[in-house]
UniProtKB/Swiss-Prot annotation:
NCBIfam families: PLP_SbnA_fam (TIGR03945)
Induction or repression: Up-regulated under iron-deficient growth conditions. Repressed by Fur under iron-rich growth conditions.
UniProt pathway annotation: Siderophore biosynthesis
Similarity remark: Belongs to the cysteine synthase/cystathionine beta-synthase family. SbnA subfamily.
This protein's record includes keyword Transferase: yes
Keywords: Pyridoxal phosphate, Transferase
Catalytic activity line of the entry: O-phospho-L-serine + L-glutamate = N-[(2S)-2-amino-2-carboxyethyl]-L-glutamate + phosphate + H(+)
Subunit (UniProt): Homodimer.
Required cofactor(s): pyridoxal 5'-phosphate
Protein name (database record): N-(2-amino-2-carboxyethyl)-L-glutamate synthase
Amino acid sequence: MIEKSQACHDSLLDSVGQTPMVQLHQLFPKHEVFAKLEYMNPGGSMKDRPAKYIIEHGIKHGLITENTHLIESTSGNLGIALAMIAKIKGLKLTCVVDPKISPTNLKIIKSYGVNVEMVEEPDAHGGYLMTRIAKVQELLATIEDAYWINQYANELNWQSHYHGAGTEIVETIKQPIDYFVAPVSTTGSIMGMSRKIKEVHPNVQIVAVDAKGSVIFGDKPINRELPGIGASRVPEILNRSEINQVIHVDDYQSALGCRKLIDYEGIFAGGSTGSIIVAIEQLITSIEEGATIVTILPDRGDRYLDLVYSDTWLEKMKSRQGVKSE
């Protein structure tokens, strides 16, 4: 038997987590802004954490067996994470997606050989989430040994981030954390990480970054194009009282934020990261200079080449927001 060093993992799943943190000196020179690079997980996003945590918990407790057929509604990243882990574990998986999934994400999911169900009809809010959930319910009623991941209501979702990135953040940042800024969709990441951070930094302010037109915090629903941030339903795992501030960012602003991050820091990240950059820019106009801000960069930019990094898409979003061309 070949002896392996501690740096050699037995499985790709062992490389989930322990993502690096970087300080964004160029973008925010008057504040200490630390970003956790969650896009450096093996599946390319922070969704590797709940996918691994939920599946391994299910296997441990006998809820998931070799005959189980996993089912989940996803805008892309969780689907990729589940597909990766299902392939490693030898499990069947069906991902329910909609037309707003990025073409790259859809290709990646299909490359793993899992089943893909594409819904076509938008829901009452103009999105597809409720339509996807209806399709999930239909599949649960017809597929034998089906197991729904159910990320919007599954307490294991936020727990994965509490024990994962949340713990890693408090182990890395030793100075007091004044603000934790995170995007929301299922709200699992902001709930889990903030709860862990508050245990060590009780005075931290929790700032949620939501999409304009998302209903999570009561905004009026409008058509949204950017996947991975916002929702057309309020997640069951959200506790609104734990959020101190909400900043809404539209699709056009998000794209500009992504491009600015590349220009200043050389970081090529996904759409919700652009929303985070815009939100932090707004936040620092009203807080003390030198404050410590911690955030997360959820996924990779190469999954959005047809969206936020497309000049055609950018012009479309610019026109939709009524921004006049210079």
